[in-house]
UniProtKB/Swiss-Prot annotation:
Name of the protein: Pentatricopeptide repeat-containing protein At4g21065
GO biological process, one term: RNA modification
Keyword Lipid metabolism part of the UniProt annotation: no
Lineage of the species this protein comes from: Eukaryota, Viridiplantae, Streptophyta, Embryophyta, Tracheophyta
Gene3D superfamilies named in the record: Tetratricopeptide repeat domain
Region (Type E(+) motif): 470-500
Species name: Arabidopsis thaliana (Mouse-ear cress)
Length: 595
C-alpha cells in the first residue's frame, strides 16, 4: 500500500498522518518533502497549520547542504501565529549553518518584535554561530551581553559558543576570559581556546594550555591534535610535535588523513624533510593536500628540484589535480633555485592546462623569480603588466631584490609604492638603509633613520627560537636575560675564535651606522641566531642537529658564520627565517648562497 493512498490516510487525523509521512520519508530528498507538502494541501490541511509547518521546516532545514532556506521561510511565513520557539530556532540555525548571518539576525529581531515567543537556551548558540560566520566581534559582544541579561550565560554550551566566537574573530583575550570564568571546562572548551591561540599568533600560549589540560587528565582528540601540531609548527617545537606523533600512533590517529597532513606540515616547517618524506610514504591514504604539503615543504627547504620531480610524479601516476597552492609551491621552488625558464613554463601550464586563474600569490612568485635572478628591471616591467594592482608584498619583493642587486633608483621607487600601501613597516626602512650603508651613503642612512623617528616607526627586533626538551627558548640581539647567559656568551666567544681560525671575516657592509670597523663587528657578533646556536651547542649532545626559527631574514654575516659553525662543530643546522629554510651542513647551505 502506498503511503499516500486514500485508505492509509483515513486511518489517522490528516495532520498527524502528514507528520508521520515527514518522519518516514522527509530526510530522503526535497522531492519527497514537496510531495508530502502537496499531499497535505490536497487533503485540506491548512497552509497556516503550525504543527505541520514546524515539522516541514525542520526537515527542510535538515536536508544536505545547502538546504532550501527560501522554501522553509515561505512555509514559516504562512504560519498564522508561530508561537513555538522551536520553529524560530530551526530557521535561525539553518541560516547560520549556510553562512547567511544577515537573515539569521533579521529573524531574531522579528522574533523579539513579534512578542509571540521568547528566545530559549538554544536560540543564542545558533545566533552566536551566525556571528561567528560574520567574524563581527562587536556584534558578538552585544549578543554576549544579551545572553548574560537573559540568564543563559552559565550554560556550558552557550559558553562554548561564545568562546568559539571570540577565538574565530581573533579576539583571543576575550576568548580566554570566557574560558577562565567557566566553572566546568569540557574538551570542546579546551579545543576552542587552544585552537584560538594557535591560529592567532600565540602558539606558545596554545602549548601552555595543552600542558595544563594534560595535567588535568583530559585526553585530547583529533581536533586537539591538529591545533597542537599547528602551534608546534609555527614556533618549531619539534620535540613536542614528535611526542604528539607518538601519541597519534598509540591511539590510532595516524589513520586520520587531516591529522596526518598537519603532521606532515609540521615536519616540513621544522626543516625535517626526511621525516616528512618518511611520513608521506607511510600514509595509506593521500589527497591533494598531502602532495601539496610535501611539494611546498621541499620547495621552502631548498629542495626545489625534488619538489618539481614530486609534482611530475603526482601528475603522471596519481591522477590528482594540482590546486592553486600546489602551483605556489612549484613557482616558489623555481624562484629559489633560479629556474626562471621553468617557472614561466609552469605558470603557463597552470593557466592553459589546468585552467587555474593566477592569484596575487602566483604573480608574486613570478616577480620573485625574476628579482632573485637579478633581473630587477624585468621584474618591474612584469609588475606593470599584471592584470591586478600589485600588493605590498610584491613591491617589498622588488625592494628586497634591488637592495641585494644594488639598484638604488628602483629601490627608492618601490619604497614610495610601499609607503602608499603600508607606511609604517620598519623592515622597508631597514632594507633601504642597508643598501645605503653598503654603498657608504651615510647621509642617506641618517635621513632614513630621522624619517623613522619622525614617523614613529620602530624597527622590529630580531628574535630566534630554539627548543630543548619540551621548552622553547627565545633570544633577542645582545640578549643576556637567559639564566645560562654567562655560559652562552663564553661559548659565543669560543665559537667566534674558532671561526676566525677558519678564515671567517665578519660581513659588515650592511651595518648601517658610520662607526669604526671593530664596533660594526661587535654589532653582528651578537645577532640573535648566533646566541641561540651558542646556547644549543652547550645544551644538546655533540653532533645532534640544531633548529633555529627566526622572525627576520638571515643577514649575510650570520649566513656565513653558520655555514662555518656547521663545519667546525660537525652539526647540521636548520634555520627557518621569514622567507625560507637554510640547511647548513659541512660548511655549505642548501640555498647555495641564493637567498
Amino acid at each position: 500500500m502506498s503511503p499516500f493512498s486514500e485508505t492509509s490516510v483515513l486511518l489517522l487525523p490528516m495532520v498527524e498522518k502528514c507528520i508521520n509521512l515527514l518522519q518516514t520519508y522527509g530526510v530522503s530528498s526535497i522531492t519527497k518533502l514537496r510531495q508530502i507538502h502537496a499531499f497535505s494541501i490536497r487533503h485540506g490541511v491548512s497552509i497556516s497549520d503550525a504543527e505541520l509547518g514546524k515539522h516541514l521546516i525542520f526537515y527542510l532545514v535538515s536536508l544536505p547542504s545547502p538546504p532550501p532556506m527560501s522554501y522553509a521561510h515561505k512555509v514559516f511565513s504562512k504560519i498564522e501565529k508561530p508561537i513555538n520557539v522551536f520553529i524560530w530556532n530551526t530557521l535561525i540555525r539553518g541560516y547560520a549553518e549556510i553562512g547567511n548571518s544577515i537573515s539569521a539576525f533579521s529573524l531574531y529581531r522579528e522574533m523579539r518584535v513579534s512578542g509571540l515567543v521568547e528566545p530559549d537556551t538554544h536560540t543564542y548558540p545558533f545566533l552566536i554561530k551566525a556571528v561567528t560566520t560574520m567574524a563581527d566581534v562587536r556584534l558578538g559582544e552585544t549578543i554576549h551581553s544579551v545572553v548574560i541579561r537573559s540568564g543563559f550565560g552559565s550554560l556550558i554550551y552557550v559558553q562554548n559558543s561564545l568562546l568559539h566566537l571570540y577565538a574565530n574573530c581573533g579576539d583571543v583575550a576575550s576568548a580566554y576570559k570566557v574560558f577562565d570564568k567557566m566553572p566546568e571546562k569540557d574538551l570542546v572548551a579546551w579545543n576552542s581556546v587552544i585552537n584560538g591561540f594557535a591560529e592567532n599568533g600565540k602558539p606558545e600560549e596554545a602549548l601552555a594550555l595543552y600542558t595544563e589540560m594534560n595535567s588535568k587528565g583530559i585526553k585530547p582528540d583529533g581536533f586537539t591534535i591538529v591545533s597542537l601540531l599547528s602551534a608546534c609548527a609555527k614556533i618549531g617545537a619539534l620535540t613536542l610535535g614528535k611526542r604528539v606523533h607518538v601519541y597519534m600512533i598509540k591511539v590510532g590517529l595516524t589513520r586520520n588523513l587531516h591529522s596526518s597532513n598537519v603532521l606532515l606540515d609540521l615536519y616540513a616547517r621544522c626543516g625535517r624533510v626526511e621525516e616528512a618524506k618518511t611520513l608521506f610514504d607511510e600514509m595509506v591514504d593521500k589527497n591533494s593536500v598531502s602532495w601539496t604539503s610535501l611539494i611546498v615543504g621541499l620547495a621552502v627547504n631548498g629542495f626545489g628540484k625534488e619538489a618539481i620531480e614530486l609534482f611530475k610524479y603526482m601528475e603522471s601516476t596519481e591522477g590528482l589535480l594540482p590546486c592553486e597552492i600546489t602551483f605556489v609551491g612549484i613557482l616558489y621552488a623555481c624562484s629559489h633555485c633560479g629556474m626562471v625558464k621553468e617557472g614561466f613554463e609552469y605558470f603557463r601550464r597552470m593557466r592553459e592546462e589546468y585552467k587555474i586563474e593566477p592569484r596575487i600569490e602566483h604573480f608574486g612568485c613570478m616577480v620573485d623569480l625574476l628579482a632573485r635572478a637579478g633581473q630587477v628591471k624585468k621584474a618591474y616591467e612584469y609588475i606593470k603588466s599584471m592584470p591586478m594592482q600589485p600588493n605590498v608584498v610584491i613591491w617589498r619583493t622588488l625592494l628586497g631584490a634591488c637592495t641585494v642587486h644594488g639598484d638604488s633608483d628602483l629601490a627608492e621607487f618601490a619604497r614610495i609604492q610601499i609607503l602608499q600601501l603600508e607606511p609604517n613597516h620598519s623592515g622597508d626602512y631597514v632594507l633601504l638603509s642597508n643598501m645605503y650603508a653598503s654603498e657608504q651613503r651615510w647621509s642617506d642612512v641618517q635621513k632614513i633613520r630621522k624619517q623613522m623617528l619622525r614617523d614613529g616607526v620602530k624597527k622590529v627586533p630580531g628574535h630566534s627560537l630554539v627548543e630543548v626538551g619540551n621548552r622553547v627558548h627565545e633570544f633577542l640581539m645582545g640578549d643576556k636575560s637567559h639564566p645560562q647567559s654567562d655560559a652562552i656568551y663564553a661559548k659565543l666567544k669560543e665559537m667566534t675564535g674558532r671561526l676566525r681560525s677558519e678564515g671567517y671575516v665578519p660581513q659588515i657592509s650592511n651595518v648601517y651606522v658610520d662607526v669604526e670597523e671593530e664596533e660594526k663587528e661587535n654589532a653582528v657578533v651578537y645577532h640573535s641566531e648566533k646566541i641561540a646556536i651558542a646556547f644549543m651547542l652547550i645544551s644538546t649532545p655533540e653532533r645532534s642537529p640544531i633548529t633555529v626559527v627566526k622572525n627576520l631574514r638571515v643577514c649575510a654575516d650570520c649566513h656565513l658564520a653558520i655555514k662555518l659553525v656547521s663545519k667546525v662543530y660537525n652539526r647540521e643546522i636548520v634555520v627557518r627565517d621569514r622567507s625560507r629554510f637554510h640547511h647548513f651542513k659541512n660548511g655549505s647551505c642548501s640555498c647555495q648562497d641564493y637567498w
